[in-house]
Amino acid sequence: MALFDGWVHCPRCANELTRRDNAVECGSCGFVLYAHSAVTASALPEDADGRVLLARRGIEPFRGSWDAVGGFVDEGEHPLDGLRREVLEETGLAFDPHELLGIWMGRYGLDDRATLNLFWTGRLAPGRPQPADDVAELRWFGPDELPPPRELAFEGLVATVLAAWRNQHP
């Protein structure tokens, strides 16, 4: 449970914490903190020519690899609101989600955090997408022009998602 590495004392009463299978617990005040998968919301924006927009990551992990546009959903944020926020932050354009492509489990970062990843297809607002935030480059790819798996982020996750997208575009 790498998520709780370094957790020794209770944030409420400062007494020692005890580790359980997927949580830390304080025997003094009863505080319990459970480990949960982090939720992500990502977009596969499509254009009128049937292409998909991918983002080249500008940060670790997987800096320089191709990824879907998106990121982590904030605490208490609806996944669709997080999706729209992330797409706007990374492309400068609003996103209209059309269809939930799928939900996949993944891992993120040096602490190997479990993630629950939601992917939508849809359209960007008119305009030219501009890379921003943690994106180094944005590029449109046709179904037969997708980057090879070795150039994709997150050890098979993005490749699996793009295969699902490509199956919708024979």
Describe every region a protein language model picked out.
Residues 19-20, 94-103:
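A short coil-to-beta-strand element that immediately follows conserved catalytic motifs
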Residues 1-7, 130-170:
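Nudix hydrolase/Nudix homology domain
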Residues 104-128:
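Active-site-adjacent beta-strand/loop module that shapes the phosphate/pyrophosphate-binding cleft
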Residues 27-52, 72:
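Conserved N-terminal beta-strand and adjoining loop/helix that marks the start
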Residues 1-6, 15-21:
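Short, flexible, mixed-charge glycine/proline-rich loop motifs
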Residues 47-89:
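Conserved Nudix-box catalytic region and its N-terminal flanking loop in Nudix hydrolases
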Residues 10-13, 26-29:
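Short cysteine-rich clusters marking metal-coordination/redox-active sites
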